[in-house]
A protein has these predicted regions:
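Conserved subregion of the PPM/PP2C metallophosphatase catalytic domain
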Residues: 1-4, 8-9, 13-14, 18-205
């Protein structure tokens, strides 16, 4: 989740989002309905900053991810077999502005070796001394170069690359990445699926 604005109010708002979402999911609400309920709560909030982008996903043992993307920058799914990318686009608007905004859930399947990157816009919008943005193309190149490295190494490389790109410039927005890699060997197209796939490995910075 990423809240509009900066400082303590934004941090408190993100904390409240996490708490509210856990309460909704813990109450056996479907994830789309839980996000809709959370959106209504935020809409009624008196906080000065109350616009929040959110990506919420549930990871299944077979590699499937069930998710809702409420206006968050689209996570990048790197397919190990084809070395191609799929962007997980929004399934609803940011939380807060509209109390009756609808949200839908979608699913994506991660095969062994696949990688998923979640990031805040402070990553791609980081500027160098000439005013150029870091951009998604640089992010994709790093993911391809590090596609066989661990999730932690990939996350650390992304963050260090952004810092090197913007030396001496204070971050204008939050810079956070989460890298999720599904472990296990990449299967041949005609090979049977393993009965118990290894769980994803996760690194966050």
């Amino acid at each position: 989740a990423d809240a509009s604005g900066h400082g303590l109010l934004a941090a408190l708002l993100v904390r409240d989002v996490y708490v509210g979402l856990r309460m909704g999911i813990g109450g056996d609400l479907k994830i789309a309905r839980a996000v809709e309920r959370l959106n209504r709560i935020l809409n009624k909030s008196r906080l000065a900053t109350k616009f929040v982008s959110l990506f919420y996903g549930e990871f299944e043992a077979n590699g499937e991810i069930i998710y809702v993307n409420a206006g968050h920058p689209g996570p990048l799914h790197l397919h190990a077999r084809t070395r191609s990318f799929t962007e997980l686009e929004s399934t609803g608007m940011v939380l807060g502005p509209s109390p009756n905004a609808p949200y839908t859930r979608r699913a994506v399947k991660m095969e062994p070796g696949d990688l998923l990157l979640l990031y805040t816009d402070g990553i791609v919008e980081a500027h160098d001394q000439r005013g150029r943005e870091f951009g998604l193309d640089r992010v994709r190149r790093i993911l391809l170069d590090y596609r066989k490295r661990s999730a932690r190494e990939t996350a650390e490389k992304l963050l260090s690359a952004v810092r090197e790109f913007s030396p001496g410039r204070p971050a204008e927005d939050d810079r956070t990445v989460v890298v999720i890699r599904r472990t296990g060997r990449l299967r041949q197209s005609n090979a049977p699926a393993p009965l118990a796939p290894a769980p994803p490995s996760i690194a966050a910075s």
